[in-house]
Amino acid sequence: TELYQFPKQSFDYVVLSQTLQAFYQPDKVLRELLRIGKSVIVSIPNFGYWKVRTSLLFFGKMPVTKTLPNTWFNTPNLHMCTIKDLFNYCESQNIAIKKVIGVNEDKISLIKKSNLEMKNLFSKLGVFLIG
């Protein structure tokens, strides 16, 4: 990434929308975003969504959905993850999780550690406010 050119805390908010999974080193991208922004908003397609899991389980192939619209051979995605994966990553790296919401169709819901399992299963997208 070319984020090195920005000084520390250059921005109040930095937004990365549904592209974290397309980087070769998403952990480094997150670190740089946290360096240049006071807060970071990251959204990810949730590979733990029940329809994605069902497609793999019953059909034995990578799913194609609205949030994952490409087939396996033409996808830009390199590092698919779930809401739970990113939540756990942030905790393991001592990254402050300010708020997490799950998005599904026309509903949004707050995700906390206490409901993480269910929200990971039933949310198409995860949106994290970290910093």
Region spans (language model):
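Generic detector of solvent-exposed, compositionally biased contiguous segments
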Residues: 1-2, 11-18, 101
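Active-site micro-motifs of SAM-dependent methyltransferase domains
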Residues: 2, 21, 49
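Short conserved loop adjoining the S-adenosyl-L-methionine
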Residues: 2-8, 24
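Flexible, charged surface loops at secondary-structure boundaries
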Residues: 7-9, 121-122
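Alpha-helix C-terminal capping/helix-to-coil transition sites in glycosyltransferase folds
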Residues: 9-10, 36
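S-adenosyl-L-methionine-dependent methyltransferase catalytic module, highlighting the catalytic core
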Residues: 28-32, 39-131
